[in-house]
Amino acid sequence: WKSSNLAPERLPHYATISDLSPVLRTPNVTFINLQYVSFEEDLNKISNELGIEVHNFDDLDHYNDIDDVAALCLSLDLVVSTKTTVPFISAGVGTSTKLANWKQSPWNNVLSNLNGPKIDVFERDTLDPWDNVFTSIAHDILKYANKRRS
């Protein structure tokens, strides 16, 4: 949901942990942390405010141990992320990836967006909140989960 690069021009790419509430409230889903910087406070907030546990592997160095992060991504059914390193890794290992993306100019999106068979992009315009993006992703997760159960 955020990057190690929080320069002002990069901030529109990232969501707050509260913005992810529609996804986090999806029933019958186990959540695994792939966030690589400053996540402890956010995970506590999710637990305290939403009553949802996001599992974190304390022995995994999310920032420096890319091989283990890739292996973890490979073991997951799907990944939800904003435009950080995470979706590049998850899609790269073949895991279905839902990308919450800030829609910029068409050329910028064509040149810098992830693309491929394992990426589903959900976009928001510059002045729009993230609500619709994460609600749409939550609906997609429910469809995916229902399909796997049947």
What would you call each of these model-derived segments?
Residues 1-150:
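Catalytic machinery of carbohydrate-active enzymes
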